[in-house]
C-alpha cells in the first residue's frame, strides 16, 4: 500500500504542471542571494528590472572564465548595504572582477535607498532559518501545491509566471500583456519620491572604490516601454546624461542600450526572451571592451 501511494505521489509530482510561482523555490532563491558561500568574478546589481532582466547564464556563455551572480532585489537601491553584499561575493583575489549596475530612475530615489527588501531578507534569513530553507524547504519544491485558480488561469491564458534560477535571475512572463499598467503606478511612485543626490553620491563613491580595487564597473539604464521611459524622465528627476557623465568621471563605464529591441510584459519588466537578448548584448559589449583594452 505504501509503495503504491509513493509511486502515485511521484507520478503526480512529475506529470503535473509546475506552479506559476513556487513558494519553495522563491524562499531558497532569496535566501541564496544573501547567504551564498561562493565567490564570483561577475556581479550584477539593481532592482527588480535587473533581477528579472539579466541572466548570468548568458554572460557566462560569452565571457570566458566567468562566474556570475545576479544580486538584484525588489525596489533595490544603492546604499552601503547593497555594496557590502557586492564586496562579500567578489573574488578579490581574481584580477578580472566585473560589476554591472542596472540603473532605473526609481533605484536612485530615497525610497529605494532604504532597500527594504534586502534588509528584510538579511534580517529574516539567519541561523536556523537559513539552514531550514537550504536543507528542508528546497526539497519541498517537488510537492509545491497547484491551486485551482492556477489551473483556470492556464486554461484561459492569463497569469504571472516565475522561474527561479540559483544564479539570482528570475525568468518572468505575465499574461495578458499590458504595458500601460506601469504608467499609473509610476506616476504615483514619483509624486513624492524623486531622484536622491545622497543615493547617487553613494553610488559614485562605491564605483570609485571598486575601480580602485581593479574592479571594472559597467552601468546601464535598464530598458523599458517607451511611454514609461518618457514618464520617468519627466517626473523622477533622473537626468541620464548627467548621471552618465558623473559615473564615467568616477571610473565607471557606460553601456548604451537600445530600448526598442526589448519587450516588457507590464511596461517595466522584460519578458524571458528579451532578458536573454539583453544579457547577450551586455556580455558582448563588455567582451568587446575587454578585448580592446
Functional labels for PLM-detected ranges:
Residues 1-16:
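Hydrophobic membrane-insertion alpha-helices, especially the h-region
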Residues 15-38:
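Alpha-helical transmembrane signal-anchor/signal-peptide segments
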Residues 41-42, 98, 218:
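Structural motif
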Residues 45, 49-134:
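Membrane-embedded segments
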Residues 103, 112-213:
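Secreted/periplasmic serine-hydrolase-like ester/acetyl group-modifying domain
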Residues 204-218, 246-253:
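A structural motif corresponding to the C-terminal end of an alpha-helix
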Residues 234-293:
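Long, positively charged, glycine-interspersed low-complexity recognition regions
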Amino acid at each position: 500500500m505504501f509503495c503504491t501511494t509513493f509511486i502515485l505521489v511521484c507520478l503526480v509530482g512529475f506529470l503535473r504542471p509546475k506552479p506559476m510561482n513556487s513558494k519553495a523555490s522563491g524562499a531558497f532563491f532569496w535566501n541564496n542571494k544573501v547567504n551564498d558561500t561562493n565567490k564570483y568574478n561577475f556581479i550584477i546589481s539593481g532592482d527588480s528590472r535587473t533581477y528579472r532582466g539579466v541572466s548570468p547564464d548568458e554572460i557566462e556563455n560569452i565571457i570566458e572564465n566567468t562566474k556570475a551572480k545576479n544580486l538584484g532585489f525588489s525596489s533595490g537601491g544603492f546604499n552601503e548595504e547593497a555594496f557590502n553584499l557586492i564586496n562579500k561575493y567578489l573574488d578579490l583575489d581574481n584580477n578580472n572582477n566585473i560589476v554591472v549596475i542596472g540603473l532605473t530612475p526609481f533605484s536612485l530615489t530615497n525610497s529605494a535607498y532604504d532597500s527594504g527588501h534586502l534588509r528584510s531578507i538579511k534580517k529574516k534569513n539567519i541561523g536556523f532559518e537559513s539552514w531550514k530553507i537550504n536543507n528542508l524547504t528546497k526539497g519541498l519544491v517537488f510537492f509545491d501545491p497547484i491551486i485551482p485558480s492556477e489551473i483556470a488561469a492556464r486554461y484561459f491564458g492569463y497569469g504571472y509566471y516565475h522561474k527561479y534560477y540559483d544564479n539570482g535571475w528570475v525568468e518572468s512572463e505575465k499574461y495578458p500583456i499590458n504595458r500601460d499598467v506601469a504608467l499609473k503606478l509610476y506616476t504615483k511612485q514619483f509624486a513624492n519620491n524623486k531622484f536622491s543626490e545622497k543615493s547617487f553620491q553613494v553610488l559614485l563613491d562605491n564605483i570609485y572604490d571598486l575601480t580602485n580595487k581593479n574592479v571594472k564597473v559597467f552601468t546601464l539604464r535598464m530598458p523599458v516601454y517607451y511611454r514609461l521611459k518618457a514618464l520617468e524622465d519627466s517626473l523622477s528627476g533622473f537626468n541620464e546624461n548627467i548621471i552618465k557623465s558623473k559615473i564615467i568621471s568616477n571610473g565607471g563605464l557606460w553601456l548604451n542600450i537600445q530600448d526598442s529591441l526589448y519587450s516588457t510584459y507590464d511596461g517595466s519588466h522584460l519578458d524571458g526572451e528579451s532578458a536573454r537578448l539583453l544579457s547577450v548584448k551586455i556580455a558582448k559589449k563588455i567582451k568587446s571592451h575587454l578585448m580592446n583594452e
